[in-house]
Amino acid sequence: MTAPSQVLKIRRPDDWHLHLRDGDMLKTVVPYTSEIYGRAIVMPNLAPPVTTVEAAVAYRQRILDAVPAGHNFTPLMTCYLTDSLDPNELERGFNEGVFTAAKLYPANATTNSSHGVTSIDAIMPVLERMEKIGMPLLVHGEVTHADIDIFDREAHFIESVMEPLRQRLTALKVVFEHITTKDAADYVHDGNERLAATITPQHLMFNRNHMLVGGVRPHLYCLPILKRNIHQQALRELVASGFNRVFLGTDSAPHARHRKESSCGCAGCFNAPTALGSYATVFEEMNALQHFEAFCSVNGPQFYGLPVNDTFIELVREEQQVAESIALTDDTLVPFLAGETVRWSVKQ
């Protein structure tokens, strides 16, 4: 039996789902991504959201200004879909290379999504335009009806929104983001070449027991919420199979500690510092390291029609302890796996 590999050399990865926030928070978190990833799809759920070409250009510049010298990083901007969005603005941004994709948040599904879409019909002209110009739609796939249990919202979304939408707009490219259920894993696996998915490290590593048994762990609380272990296992099996329409999307979502550790805590895991090593650990546990590079660095560009990165990075298999916290101007940020010993990390 061969000893496990101590170094993994892979083509530089991309993060196809990332929150960078703004202001001081942005300046703090950007380097954790720009150090490792060549590109990242940046979420538009600021307050106010990014709904115009002008706003996206300005936000992109703020991100680039926060990238340390020596990092070669390209933020890929997205447009936040609203009921009142002008299709011409969206097309202009796409044609000018400002918008890479557009993001569909059902109204009030997650952080800063109150401006989101109230119904698919309300944005049908926009979606039809996206289908025509080949612009990908990124979907937070949960229904938000009060009568639907939070653990069932993704499965309901497939049936009531996603499938009717894809039947109606058969040429639309769709990324089902941060999938968390066996239902979604099966749906994407059985779909055609115009449907892909991202998966976060926390949904591969943990299930709802980890978050709730023996005490509530607020730093594992994110949306979509962690599900049962059968769903976690389905996600792990999907990535381990080498399926090529699933790719890395951390959904790294920083919140200051006092906003996570409170009587009404915010959803989101700040996993940018530890995500890549976490994914490597999962692939190793599943005896699937041969598919790790494709998941991180090839499948995403392939789906988006972009070139793969031409530089490489190395991960090293040696135990390291994750920092307990990261300083902010007037608070701290608790990273995913804070204080824990991890098996894989990016070689500095």
Swiss-Prot record:
Gene3D superfamilies in the cross-refs: Metal-dependent hydrolases (3.20.20.140)
Keywords carried by this UniProt record: Hydrolase, Metal-binding, Pyrimidine biosynthesis, Zinc
Subunit structure: Homodimer.
Homology family: Belongs to the metallo-dependent hydrolases superfamily. DHOase family. Class II DHOase subfamily.
Lineage start: Bacteria, Pseudomonadati, Pseudomonadota, Gammaproteobacteria, Enterobacterales
Name assigned to this protein: Dihydroorotase
Amino-acid positions noted as binding substrate in the UniProt annotation, renumbered to this chain: 19-21, 45, 140, 223, 255, 267
Annotated source species: Shigella boydii serotype 18 (strain CDC 3083-94 / BS512)
Cofactor: Zn(2+)
PROSITE patterns, A to Z: DIHYDROOROTASE_1 (PS00482), DIHYDROOROTASE_2 (PS00483)
Gene: pyrC
